Design a protein with these regions (language model features):
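Helical substrate-recognition/capping region of FAD-dependent monooxygenase/halogenase enzymes
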Residues: 1-7, 11, 27, 83, ...
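Core beta-strand elements of the Rossmann-like FAD/NAD(P) dinucleotide-binding domain
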Residues: 4-6, 150-159
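N-terminal Rossmann-like FAD-binding beta1-loop-alpha1 element of flavoenzymes
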Residues: 6-33
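Active-site-adjacent segment of FAD-dependent monooxygenases/related oxidoreductases
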Residues: 42-45, 49-116
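Conserved FAD-binding catalytic core of PHBH/FMO-like flavoproteins
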Residues: 114-115, 138, 159, 163-268
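A conserved short coil-to-beta-strand element within the FAD-binding core of flavoproteins
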Residues: 127-141
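FAD/FMN-dependent oxidoreductases across multiple families
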Residues: 237-301, 321-326, 336, 343, ...
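Internal hydrophobic alpha-helix adjacent to the cofactor/substrate pocket in enzyme cavities
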Residues: 303-323
């Protein structure tokens, strides 16, 4: 039997698996991606992407390309049985450099990811290859794989990432249980083309007679989702005639122009794997956690998983960090993934009421919320979405008692800045692929001991001094600091961020989470604590 060896194997070539593969390529790590299917499924699946997920794609140079097939700043609206909008989510902020609500079609994103993989000769995508078995010891993971011609071979790797969806073969091979519940009501999902409906938003129609969803998609496509009521026959409800009659009730004869792409009944699950990491194998995306669609966070959670695990893999394989940091992925991601599933459950509960009395109470409550400015803003700006916050893991909290305003462990902001050449850029474009240490109006590199300077140089750490906008002697004489990168805070958003913390130096991880906040005098000691965590 043929035997091969690589550094990382990724099982599954969906958006999560391919994004992880791009990061492996970016870090120069040999990687094989195994995908059972021969090609990309030609219809939409995931359709919502947020600012955090786009920032992950930005890290591999894909965000701008993917955005060409997206509709940005799409509102989310709840309607009652009378067709009156009783709640709206319409964020106007861009804390992380991208719009918060974007509509896309998964097959187009997958196409972009696969097209751009040619930039990384160290990464190989193998379509039509099925993982049959997985075993691991202290040093190696061994996979038994069947190729597209039916030949079986062994593939060994240092690490494996299971990105193979809700029915994950990797998870099953590891014997990891998927904990949670399966929701009793099924939904019929209908993807259509040649759409002419003038409704450029995502509409959740909370009609107790039959809750349904209507999602505006790119390129004249639209998704409809209808709840199956108690006693209804699934097969009969999935017939095209039945579906056209349901849609006709909402758009009239315009339904005759629609092309039906796909009709499928779905059972929604709210489940989380008992472990995200076992030995040298990590589960990401739906392989680790499955969410109902109502918060639009399923794929976004998966991309957060990828961002968390890939830099750790790279650091271990390249000898910068000890292998024990691999397990921190579970510690840092499980809580937030679980919180977002709870959010989806709650949003689905608001939508799915079939008791008219309860639906009336809900409508009244939201009417009351909308009459209070602060509460209405809370809805509009999607402030009720749980923030990813790392309280334990590869971060260092100087305060013994954590506070709500502690920004350590949260995602760092991404405003526009000006580089030394006067070019306006997103912040991440100058942070690099590794750790970054930024000082607000101070040079952080001046406060490191020789030992810490040498240690963080091995990480290719980027040292940056942030200056107020136009604080130099002239347009061609920006303020600079010797030996480090100086940038200008052109929109004063970094100044605003630092005004909310006590200190003027921030340490940012490769995944753009804040590892520590400190003062120049304490910086060397803080970096020593972080180094201890890594090594």
């Amino acid at each position: 039997m043929k035997q091969e060896r690589t550094r990382v194997v990724i099982v599954g070539a969906g958006p999560n698996g391919m994004t992880a593969a791009h990061y492996m390529g970016l870090y120069g790590i040999d990687c094989v991606v195994l995908e059972l299917a021969d090609g990309i499924l030609p219809y939409p699946r995931a359709v919502g992407m947020d600012d955090e997920a786009l920032r992950v794609l930005q890290g591999i140079g894909i965000a701008e390309l993917a955005a060409r097939d997206m509709i940005s700043n799409v509102p989310l609206r709840y309607y009652n049985a009378r067709g009156v909008c009783f709640a709206e989510v319409k964020p106007s902020t861009a804390h992380y450099g991208w719009p918060m609500r974007n509509i896309f079609m998964q097959q187009l994103l997958e196409g972009t990811l696969r097209e751009q993989l040619v930039n990384y000769p160290c990464v190989e995508l193998r379509q039509g290859h099925e993982m049959l078995e997985l075993e691991q010891d202290a040093d190696t993971v061994t996979l038994l794989v069947r190729d597209a011609q039916g030949e079986v071979y062994r593939l060994q790797a240092d690490y494996v990432v299971g990105a193979d969806g809700g029915r994950s073969s990797v998870r099953k091979q590891l014997g990891i249980e998927l904990l949670g519940l399966t929701h009793p009501r099924k939904w019929v999902v209908v993807d259509t083309a040649n759409d002419t409906l003038d409704a450029p938003y995502t509409a959740l129609h909370a009609d107790p007679q039959r809750p349904f969803v209507c999602i505006y998609l790119p390129y004249r496509q639209r998704r409809w989702e209808f709840m199956l009521l108690e006693g209804e026959d699934e097969a009969g409800m999935c017939e095209e005639t039945t579906i056209r009659n349901l849609i006709r009730g909402h758009i009239g004869d315009a339904v005759d122009q629609l092309q039906i792409i796909r009709i499928r009944a779905y059972t929604h699950n709210s489940r989380v794997a008992a472990r995200f990491v076992q030995g040298r194998v990590a589960l990401v995306g739906d392989a680790a956690h499955i969410s109902p669609p109502w918060a639009g966070q399923g794929l976004n959670s998966g991309l957060r998983d990828v961002a968390n695990v890939v830099w750790k893999l790279a650091a271990i394989i390249q000898g910068r960090a000890c292998a024990s940091i691999f397990s921190s992925y579970d510690q840092e991601r499980r809580g937030h993934a679980t919180d977002l599933i709870a959010l989806a459950d709650n949003m689905g509960a608001v939508l799915g009421l079939t008791n008219p009395l309860m639906a009336g109470v809900r409508d009244w409550l939201f009417q009351a919320v909308n009459s209070v400015d602060n509460l209405r803003s809370h809805l509009l700006e999607f402030k009720f979405k749980p923030k990813a916050t790392i309280t334990k893991g590869l971060v260092y909290h100087e305060r013994a008692q954590l506070h709500e305003d502690d920004l350590v462990g949260q995602l760092f902001v991404q405003p526009d800045i000006e580089d030394p050449l006067g070019q306006r850029r997103r912040l991440d474009e100058v942070l690099g692929r590794s750790y970054s240490i930024l000082g607000y109006r101070v040079n952080p590199a001046e406060y490191l001991s020789e030992e810490m300077t040498a240690y963080w140089a091995r990480w290719e750490t980027q040292f940056i001094q942030i200056n107020r906008s136009r604080s130099g002697a002239g347009r061609h004489q920006p303020l600079s600091a010797p030996g480090i990168l100086s940038i200008e805070d052109v929109d004063n958003r970094l100044g605003e961020w630092f005004s909310n913390v006590r200190d003027c130096i921030v340490v940012v991880r490769p995944d753009r989470f804040v590892a520590a906040i400190t003062t120049p005098e304490r910086l060397d000691g803080v970096l020593r604590k972080l180094a201890e965590q890594l090594s």
